[in-house]
Structures are given as structure tokens and as C-alpha cells.
């Protein structure tokens, strides 16, 4: 089903000019003429100013943000959302892209940004899922990506030709721990998942057991 029409994606990467703004107004008008029943939206690149002529053209708006991966820290996402909302309470705001890479054979006891570990990816999505849960005024959030996917130009985490931001591996067979973060938030049926099962080689006398569940309590035997 078509839910809404997007008129552009990260268009300000190349800069802004009046012709660009005018074209977006023309596209908005055309969308409404062709289909007045659906909303229109735009996906702003992260560096797009929070005020300016590219805002309030479409019915709703979204940003592509990667704080905690390409730059900055994941904890910047919540404050940024709050600041934008305070400055623009009339704009219906969403997040059209967010994510970080996680490779299922990379693991860490001290996960951190850009280590490509499954553990860091899970921590990142734990934060983001809660950030959206705490802000009911966000109209939509779109994780990038459901599945790892091919990308010839990439060479990330020792893997060539693949973007590893998926919650599931490229062959659709292995659900990463980050997948179960969202299942714990959204699943109606009872679920439980013990994370870190692929992190088999660990140092130390004790280990932390992390569990994702939509139940109030779980018991580990």
C-alpha cells in the first residue's frame, strides 16, 4: 500500500538555491493534484538547518540522522529531536533513516561506535527504540535497514560490497540481536530472546546475560 508521497531525499547535499525551493513547491502542488488523499513528505539530510525555506512545504517532514555511527554519539538523537520540536511545534517530524552497522561474527565486551560489533548495534537500537517510545509526537521512524544489502562501493568492517546496517543478514537467515529489540517493543505475542549467543569466546570469570522480552519478568535457569 502507498501511505504517502516523498518528493525528495537528502536534496540539500548539493546546496540550496531558490530554483530548488520553487521546484519543491511545484512538486507539492502536483502531488496534491494527482492524489489529494495522501500526505506528502520529504527526507532531509542530517545537516539541513532546522529553520529555512525547505520546511513547511510538505504535509509532514523527516530527517535522515546517523548520530552514533557516521558522527557524534547515539545520545545526541533525543536532544536533537526535542530541540527541533521545541523550535517547530507545528511541524510533524519523523526520522526517515537511522541505523548502524553490525556484523554477526564481530563481538565486544566493551562495544563502541564503529567497531561493527553486534553488541554495539544492539545498544544503538536499544537507545533509538526508547527515544521514539518517549516521544509520541514523532509521526514515523524508519530503520535503515531491515536486511543487510549489497553495495559495490562499500568496504566496511572487513566486508567488501555490503552494507551491514540490517537487523537481519543479507541471506535473510539470521536475525541479529538488534532485531529482537523491536520485537520486544512491538510484539503482541509473548517473546524472549537471549542476546549475545554468537559471542562464544569470552574472557573473565563472569559474564553478563542480556535478555530482550515483552514480559514483565523472565527467569533464567
Question: Positions of the model-derived regions?
Answer:
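Extended substrate-binding grooves/exosites of carbohydrate-active enzymes
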Residues: 1-221
Amino acid at each position: 500500500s502507498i501511505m504517502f508521497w516523498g518528493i525528495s531525499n537528502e536534496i540539500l547535499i548539493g546546496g540550496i538555491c531558490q530554483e530548488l525551493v520553487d521546484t519543491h513547491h511545484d512538486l507539492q502542488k502536483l502531488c496534491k493534484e494527482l492524489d489529494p488523499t495522501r500526505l506528502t513528505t520529504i527526507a532531509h539530510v542530517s545537516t539541513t538547518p532546522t529553520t529555512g525555506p525547505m520546511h513547511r512545504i510538505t504535509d509532514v517532514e523527516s530527517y535522515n540522522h546517523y548520530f552514533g555511527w557516521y558522527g557524534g554519539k547515539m545520545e545526541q538523537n533525543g536532544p536533537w529531536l526535542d530541540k527541533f520540536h521545541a523550535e517547530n511545534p507545528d511541524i510533524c517530524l519523523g526520522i526517515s533513516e537511522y541505523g548502524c552497522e553490525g556484523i554477526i561474527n564481530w563481538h565486544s565486551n566493551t562495544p563502541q561506535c564503529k567497531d561493527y560489533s553486534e553488541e554495539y548495534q544492539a545498544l544503538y537500537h536499544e537507545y533509538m527504540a526508547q527515544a521514539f517510545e518517549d516521544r509520541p509526537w514523532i509521526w514515523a521512524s524508519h530503520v535503515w535497514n531491515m536486511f543487510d544489502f549489497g553495495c559495490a562501493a562499500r568496504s566496511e568492517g572487513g566486508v567488501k560490497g555490503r552494507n551491514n546496517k540490517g537487523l537481519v543478514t543479507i541471506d535473510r537467515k539470521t536475525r541479529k540481536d538488534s532485531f529482537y529489540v523491536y520485537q520486544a517493543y512491538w510484539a503482541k505475542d509473548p517473546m524472549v530472546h537471549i542476546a549475545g549467543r554468537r559471542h562464544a569466546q569470552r574472557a573473565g570469570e563472569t559474564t553478563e546475560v542480556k535478555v530482550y522480552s515483552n514480559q514483565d519478568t523472565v527467569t533464567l535457569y
